[in-house]
Amino acid sequence: MSTTTVPELKQISREEAMRLGPGWSHSCHAMLYAANPGQLFGRIPMRFSVLMQMRFDGLLGFPGGFVDRRFWSLEDGLNRVLGLGLGGLRLTEADYLSSHLTEGPHRVVAHLYARQLTLEQLHAVEISAVHSRDHGLEVLGLVRVPLYTQKDRVGGFPNFLSNAFVSTAKYQLLFALKVLNMMPSEKLAEALASATEKQKKALEKLLPPSS
């Protein structure tokens, strides 16, 4: 199977991001993950559990949102949003992972934070999220990312990548999995290629045959 190159966005440092002018908006999101020694069906290693969420608009993304830099630091703004969607979890500058400039007409710098939890702590976050203020409103539920690929080369991570993601969320997921050494680059590219091929075939089925 041919592979697809993992897409890249322009990465800048936190310091560079802080020097951007008032014409830029800042979004802050958190990737919470835990090592998972479990096996699916007793034979497929789970390796890690990563949390994402289904949003009100039907798109997948990481917990977080926009931060108004006039009133909040990045971390304070992020924690404020997380409190509405997850509960009492608080991240710090030590959890900062990356900043990327988004493509398109809107000038947005996307900041990603990542924290490794124990599997028990991750499960506690899932339980807490159900009782948060935004559950069932802006947040429709947390999901765990399947970081495995089944024998058909589509089930698992490739199928997950075939979903619709908000803004830079899909790229941030791929970037974090790579830089945190959670999945080799070639495996990421293979999964992305399988997802792209699946989407292409689905689109071909919807389009009328050319005369």
From Swiss-Prot:
Gene Ontology terms: cellular component: nucleus
GO biological process: negative regulation of double-strand break repair via nonhomologous end joining
Domain of life: Eukaryota
Pfam families for this protein: Nudt16-like
Main location: nucleus
Classification via InterPro entries: NUDIX_hydrolase-like_dom_sf, NudT16
Required for interaction with TP53BP1 (site feature) positions: 10
Region of interest: Interaction with PXN: 118-205
Swiss-Prot/TrEMBL keywords: Isopeptide bond, Nucleus, RNA-binding, Ubl conjugation
Localization, UniProt: Nucleus
Annotated disulfide bonds: none
GO molecular function terms noted in the UniProt entry: snoRNA binding
UniProt keyword RNA-binding, yes or no: yes
Cross-linked residues, Glycyl lysine isopeptide (Lys-Gly) (interchain with G-Cter in ubiquitin): 10, 151
Functional note: Key regulator of TP53BP1 required to stabilize TP53BP1 and regulate its recruitment to chromatin. In absence of DNA damage, interacts with the tandem Tudor-like domain of TP53BP1, masking the region that binds histone H4 dimethylated at 'Lys-20' (H4K20me2), thereby preventing TP53BP1 recruitment to chromatin and maintaining TP53BP1 localization to the nucleus.
Subunit structure: Homodimer. Interacts with TP53BP1 (via the Tudor-like domain); interaction is abolished following DNA damage and TP53BP1 phosphorylation by ATM. Interacts (via the cytoplasmic part) with SDC4. Interacts with TGFB1I1 and PXN.
Family statement drawn from the similarity comment of this UniProt entry: Belongs to the Nudix hydrolase family. TIRR subfamily.
Designated name of the protein: Tudor-interacting repair regulator protein
Annotated organism of origin: Mus musculus (Mouse)
Gene that encodes it: Nudt16l1
